[in-house]
């Protein structure tokens, strides 16, 4: 089966929404939206993504689990799906370049996204065909199943975190520390080979009742230091077993998505 036929099938089947409690965000909803979808032909996941910039019929929600299957099936066309170890944690990283699509499907653009272990928690990036991750279309996003999520109200925990910025192979990595009593999240990620060489969370706070966090970020990279970053994200799972979020900058090349697992 051609990749175009498979992708159309996935999109068509994903039009029915699931009842899972999906939390997530995008740095540009005109390009990418996240949500929930039940895919009868390709079950196994609840979190989904929509390429809003593509228009109908390609802008229906498609489950990340289905996109993972596509990335696994078409390696000969340039896609990839790989398990990557960061510290002691495993992240599943998918790469679907527009070059793997026929010209008629170029509006679907380029995808890099990761999954935190086997949890229904995803984070990634997208940019238009003909653009690069340094272009204004560079959009980052995260989505996860919020069912049964609980957040402690005391104690601390560290998270091993992977970040995606312009590459599915050169990942950022680092540790974030949550102080559940104070409601703060802090730490940094570093890497090479992307626009961002370091990303630091500044003044990020959360409410255990909502499991959401927000604050500021600074980054250093190919365009120097950028202090304009805005961070948003969410804890997922029992006792905040995982997290995911995005850092958005006035220079879209610095936009970064990240996800992490509790140590």
Give each language-model segment a name.
Residues 1-21:
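Gram-negative bacterial Sec-dependent N-terminal signal peptides
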Residues 20-263:
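Mature soluble binding/inhibitory domains
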């Amino acid at each position: 089966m051609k990749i175009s036929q498979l992708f159309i099938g996935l999109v068509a089947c994903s039009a029915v929404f699931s009842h899972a409690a999906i939390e997530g965000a995008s740095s540009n909803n005109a390009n990418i939206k996240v949500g929930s979808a039940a895919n009868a032909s390709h079950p196994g996941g609840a979190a989904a993504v929509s390429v809003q910039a593509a228009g109908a019929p390609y802008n229906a929600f498609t489950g990340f689990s289905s996109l993972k299957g596509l990335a696994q099936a078409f390696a000969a066309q340039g896609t990839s799906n790989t398990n990557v170890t960061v510290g002691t944690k495993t992240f599943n990283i998918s790469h679907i370049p527009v070059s793997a699509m026929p010209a008629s499907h170029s509006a679907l653009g380029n995808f890099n996204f990761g999954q935190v272990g086997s949890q229904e928690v995803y984070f990634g990036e997208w940019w238009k065909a003909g653009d690069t991750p340094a272009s204004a279309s560079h959009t980052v996003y995260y989505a996860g199943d919020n069912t049964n999520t609980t957040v402690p109200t005391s104690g601390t925990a560290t998270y091993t975190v992977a970040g995606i910025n312009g590459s599915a192979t050169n990942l950022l990595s680092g540790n974030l520390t949550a102080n559940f009593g104070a409601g703060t999240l802090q730490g940094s990620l570093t890497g090479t080979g992307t626009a961002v060489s370091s990303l630091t969370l500044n003044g990020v706070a959360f409410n255990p009742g909502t499991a959401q966090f927000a604050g500021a970020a600074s980054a250093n990279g190919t365009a120097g230091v950028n202090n304009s970053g805005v961070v948003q994200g969410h804890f997922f799972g029992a006792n905040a077993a995982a997290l995911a979020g995005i850092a958005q900058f006035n220079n879209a090349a610095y936009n970064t998505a990240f996800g992490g697992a509790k140590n």
